[in-house]
């Protein structure tokens, strides 16, 4: 899919230049009429264009899904614009005092009027207008939906239009005259966040909604010319025959702005401007300051009083100043490159994740989707990093064990569905709703209590088909009752296979019984006319040993991370896996220990000869089993094996460097080079060994 922002980004430069023109009147010395028809008419599309950008990139997604992340994006935007407005107020405070926009003698109501509607300097109205408009449209979208929001915003624009370019006409109507007298007691202009901004935010939202269907069209070009010519004649008529209060709003301006924006979405210029959003924002903020400076200089250099030359100089200087500030920002900014973890870390391979998912997709039916199981910090590998990589390759459904994990994943920016597999106390129901999570109903009582909270939440129904851990009784009457609860939006039903990891006859019999029972429940629900939603019963071993099953989802955990749980248990379907994680730690010091000396805690390790000992910055608090102490663990460095000696400490371990070449302090060693082998030797499964990896380990995604 082509990138829709290229044309938008480049036009930001033109739009910023138009704004400068509006404030400098470039044709005044040559042909003032051109300022009327070009600067104060055609160039008026510039500010609506910027508001439409906000509607498109910020509110478009929100209009379709009021998710936690989309709401957070709006809150962050409002905070950002608020801070920019505050800094801009401080920057222009001396000039605001000089031109009388603000005064220390003003009363509170007048100051509020200036700060909330007019702006403390003539161009700063944009920021409070953006804040007010965004808040207003967000509230309207949430309460009345997109179509009515567009209708309401259009009505507001028409009211504003009557107090702007059409004021000379509306002012003749007594009732309207009283209305605008009241409005102007609160704001100098109707060009504000109440009357002006909302309609253009809505047009940006509309453009977002139709962008995927949008194709290049000559009709768009024709419509733009028709509307821009029509708006020009509208402007000429109003300026010639009426008393225009202001000329920011025209009847045909929304149509011109919308058609222009749709054309720009189709425009894919080869020229790309880096950081165009930041660059044009700085130009917008700084250009009045440049205007003041150029005006002051023009007193001594008369040629600069030529309006066109004045305009060009202001434009060039504004862009140069903005670019210099961006360059300074880059130098002052802390490097985005990750600081190497000096102690210990996990290196996660994105390519290995992609490989494993591709191998899994070869096994499962084409109509079956993958749920990424990222509970227990993605089996110790890093929940946020793994989920981020899975999202990139099309996985949009995730499973966690607890609500705390679910909230952390959502706060990381994850946009997918998040299913909580475990029990969540009903008192946390507000959090389930707030973060748009999907809660498993793990028992009849759990479902009843959640429903009594009278807060609608998304759910999956977990059925106990024979594992006897969590799940409602496999009684179709009880299950039917759950589906009828008014506050539980049950979107799926699932179970968990207790013995799918084994091909022994008793395990196969148990698994087949569970599958049979689950299918019968689905069949009975279907006969009852209940739409039971998504279905899933297989986890990693369920797809390897029962590949013939076909449900809506499979829950993939250990296979995603490149391991089998137990390499001694054969599977019906082989799979080529690549481990995604390497555990690394630094060599932080070394010393020579004489023969006969003990090393580490206790008397378990006594060197028989003069030995070079190193200290590696990782221990059992980081998930390295203490049971591996004293030569049971082998580390690696550049293909060389390094034996661990002595008892593994909480934060460190000792290694024998006697036979190791070319190793220096702060070099990184691979601590668990063969996780599956270690799990086998410790008589456990790789799931346990991985999930032990501690939170102190940093995570590097490569």
Swiss-Prot record:
Record InterPro entries: Acyl_transf_3_dom, Ala_racemase, Ala_racemase/Decarboxylase_C, Ala_racemase_C, Ala_racemase_N, Ala_racemase_pyridoxalP-BS, PLP-binding_barrel, Serine/alanine_racemase
GO-annotated biological processes: D-alanine biosynthetic process; response to antibiotic
Family annotation (SUPFAM superfamilies): Alanine racemase C-terminal domain-like (SSF50621), PLP-binding barrel (SSF51419)
Compartment(s) where it occurs, according to its Swiss-Prot or TrEMBL record: Cell membrane
Protein EC: 5.1.1.-
Topological domain ranges for the Cytoplasmic compartment: 1-12, 61-77, 142, 213-218, 270-276, 329-702
Membership in a protein family: In the N-terminal section; belongs to the acyltransferase 3 family.
Protein name listed in UniProt: Amino-acid racemase
Species of the source: Enterococcus faecalis (Streptococcus faecalis)
Gene: vanTE
